[in-house]
């Protein structure tokens, strides 16, 4: 499968048209950003690491009935995917209080939530990806009430699969962001699942093993990503 036209370059990936109009190649970059592109940098081999992690996770989810855009891992940096009409809704699922949940509502960081919280955000960097509810999403023409409910249902099912899967690997899935899109009338999970889009804490030490190490200048970013990759791929 050949890369033809560059369709889009985002903060973490390039998207290429292929010989097949229904398929794209998602190329993972080493660029790192935080706070909606206000902080920029690079993480050595991040693209290689995230492609490996995301490919493994998409495969696992697909085997458990979650429809995804993943087709195959082509090489270290490239993933073959179904071409999606991206829904401009980011779905964040939270199992443990961290990040903006702590800042907005005053939770103590590390508080285990009695029930996972599913949040919707408008995918718009210019507006700093504001939090929204179902009514906002429908009013903005981003989807129907039924589609928004489907996104939340899918996020909850994905969470129910990921939490125990990561727990077996001594990783606590604190929270994570998902993106979805339409492909031939079906809503599929898109984008990636990686330390760029998830908060992972070591289940025993509580050490942060995700992009918070970059966001918060904690150091050891490459080692943290590599450790997640090692645990994801070892079983």
UniProtKB/Swiss-Prot annotation:
The record's GO molecular-function terms, alphabetically, read:
ATP binding; phosphoribosylaminoimidazolesuccinocarboxamide synthase activity
Pathway in which the depicted protein is active = Purine metabolism; IMP biosynthesis via de novo pathway; 5-amino-1-(5-phospho-D-ribosyl)imidazole-4-carboxamide from 5-amino-1-(5-phospho-D-ribosyl)imidazole-4-carboxylate: step 1/2
Q: Give its E.C. classification number.
A: 6.3.2.6
**Phosphoprotein among keywords:** no
According to UniProt, the reaction catalysed is:
5-amino-1-(5-phospho-D-ribosyl)imidazole-4-carboxylate + L-aspartate + ATP = (2S)-2-[5-amino-1-(5-phospho-beta-D-ribosyl)imidazole-4-carboxamido]succinate + ADP + phosphate + 2 H(+)
Q: Report the record's Gene Ontology biological process terms.
A: 'de novo' IMP biosynthetic process; cobalamin biosynthetic process
Q: Which UniProt keywords apply?
A: ATP-binding, Ligase, Nucleotide-binding, Purine biosynthesis
Q: Pfam family example for this protein?
A: SAICAR_synt
Q: Does the keyword Ligase apply?
A: yes
Task: Give the family this protein belongs to, as stated in its UniProt record.
Answer: Belongs to the SAICAR synthetase family.
- Report what the protein is called: Phosphoribosylaminoimidazole-succinocarboxamide synthase
Organism this protein belongs to: Chlorobaculum parvum (strain DSM 263 / NCIMB 8327) (Chlorobium vibrioforme subsp. thiosulfatophilum)
């Amino acid at each position: 499968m050949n890369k033809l036209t560059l369709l889009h370059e985002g903060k973490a990936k390039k998207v290429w048209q292929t010989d097949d109009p229904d398929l794209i190649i998602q190329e993972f970059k080493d660029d790192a950003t935080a706070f909606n592109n206000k902080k920029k940098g690079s993480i050595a081999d991040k693209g290689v690491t995230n492609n490996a992690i995301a490919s493994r996770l998409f495969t696992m989810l697909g085997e458990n009935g979650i429809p995804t855009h993943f087709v195959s891992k082509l090489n270290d940096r490239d993933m073959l995917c179904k071409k999606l009409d991206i829904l401009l809704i980011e779905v964040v699922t939270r199992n443990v209080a961290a990040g903006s949940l702590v800042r907005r509502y005053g939770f103590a960081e590390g508080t285990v939530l009695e029930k996972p919280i599913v949040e919707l955000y408008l995918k718009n960097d210019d507006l700093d990806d504001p939090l929204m509810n179902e009514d906002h999403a429908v009013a903005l023409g981003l989807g129907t009430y039924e589609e928004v409910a489907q996104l939340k249902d899918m996020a909850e099912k994905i969470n129910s699969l990921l939490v125990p899967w990561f727990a077996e690997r001594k990783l606590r899935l604190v929270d994570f962001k998902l993106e979805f899109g339409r492909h031939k009338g079906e809503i599929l999970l898109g984008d990636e699942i990686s330390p760029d889009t998830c908060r992972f804490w070591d289940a025993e030490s509580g050490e942060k093993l995700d992009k918070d190490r970059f966001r918060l200048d904690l150091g050891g970013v490459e080692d943290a990503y590599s450790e997640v990759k090692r645990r994801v791929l070892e079983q």
